[in-house]
């Protein structure tokens, strides 16, 4: 599944894998874009898979004309060895009935590569919130049992709110309660697979609506940064402006190109 860019397979033992779920507003994918661009992570390989819709494009993180013509595809892996970080970016949707196969192959690769933990950045439909969720923060987290053992104390110290269980079948009053992530794509599937296969997975998500989701992505990476300290503020002043996340060059065309002057 994983094809390295170089001649040798990179050593990912002990690394933290960051990845998005293709979810409402593409918030997770935008957040991974911010992380890769800000940390200037380099590409170490890609996933050769029939589970995603084929896609090819220019380098989304181009910083100069020299590297703008590099090609990118639907599933690529980036790394920053100095911080033991690996990022998987997904750029297309799943082919019908292929998402479970992808999750199984992905987690098998995670185990074989020796990654210490997986952090999934996701989102969920804001209109599915209940009254309690409407009155609280829009951010939530989920931890698989094997992840809870190692990070539960740290997470609790941040005063984060865990994703609440809701009726499995909302229309039935006495329905059993379970974890549901409406609009979350493979989020729930990854969580269930991680629980059954004892893989340490943390899911961080935000309740959002479709639209300009750049502010949601910025909020999600800052939420992640509270825990992992990917980048640190320049000063200790808590009232200082937000952290210097770098938007990739490809975001200039996030909503398409400008209107042609000939229209006027």
UniProtKB/Swiss-Prot annotation:
It is found in: Nucleus. It comes from the Eukaryota. Gene3D superfamilies: PAC-like subunit (3.40.50.10900). The keyword Ribonucleoprotein does not apply. Keywords: Chaperone, Nucleus, Phosphoprotein. Degraded by the proteasome upon completion of 20S proteasome maturation. SUPFAM superfamilies: Cgl1923-like (SSF159659). The modification Phosphothreonine is found at residue 137. Its main location: nucleus. GO terms for cellular component: cytosol; nucleus. GO terms for biological process: chaperone-mediated protein complex assembly; proteasome assembly. Coiled coil: none annotated. Belongs to the PSMG2 family. PANTHER family: PROTEASOME ASSEMBLY CHAPERONE 2 (PTHR12970:SF1). Forms a heterodimer with PSMG1. The PSMG1-PSMG2 heterodimer interacts directly with the PSMA5 and PSMA7 proteasome alpha subunits. Chaperone protein which promotes assembly of the 20S proteasome as part of a heterodimer with PSMG1. The PSMG1-PSMG2 heterodimer binds to the PSMA5 and PSMA7 proteasome subunits, promotes assembly of the proteasome alpha subunits into the heteroheptameric alpha ring and prevents alpha ring dimerization. This is Proteasome assembly chaperone 2. It comes from Bos taurus.
């Amino acid at each position: 599944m994983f094809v390295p860019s170089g001649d040798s397979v990179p050593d990912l033992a002990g690394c933290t894998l960051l990845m998005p779920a293709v979810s409402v507003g593409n918030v997770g994918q935008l957040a991974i874009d911010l992380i890769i661009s800000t940390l200037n992570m380099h590409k170490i390989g890609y996933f050769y898979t029939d589970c995603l819709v084929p896609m090819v494009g220019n380098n989304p993180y181009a910083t100069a004309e020299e590297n703008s013509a590099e090609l990118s595809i639907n599933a690529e892996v980036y790394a920053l060895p100095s911080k033991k970080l690996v990022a998987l970016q997904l750029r297309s949707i799943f082919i019908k009935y292929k998402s479970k196969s992808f999750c199984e192959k992905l987690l098998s690769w995670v185990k074989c590569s020796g990654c210490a933990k997986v952090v999934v950045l996701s989102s969920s439909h804001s209109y599915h919130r209940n009254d309690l969720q409407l009155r609280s923060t829009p951010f939530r987290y989920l931890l698989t049992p094997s992840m809870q053992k190692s990070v539960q104390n740290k997470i609790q110290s941040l005063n984060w709110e865990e994703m609440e269980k809701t009726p499995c079948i909302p229309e039935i009053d006495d329905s059993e309660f379970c974890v549901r992530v409406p609009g979350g794509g493979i989020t729930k599937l990854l969580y269930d697979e991680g629980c059954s296969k004892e893989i340490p997975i943390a899911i961080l998500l935000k309740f959002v609506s479709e639209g300009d989701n750049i502010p949601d992505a910025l909020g999600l990476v800052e939420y992640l940064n509270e825990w992992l300290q990917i980048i640190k503020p320049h000063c200790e002043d808590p009232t200082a402006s937000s952290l210097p996340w770098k938007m990739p060059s490809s975001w200039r065309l996030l909503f398409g190109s400008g209107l042609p002057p000939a229209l006027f």
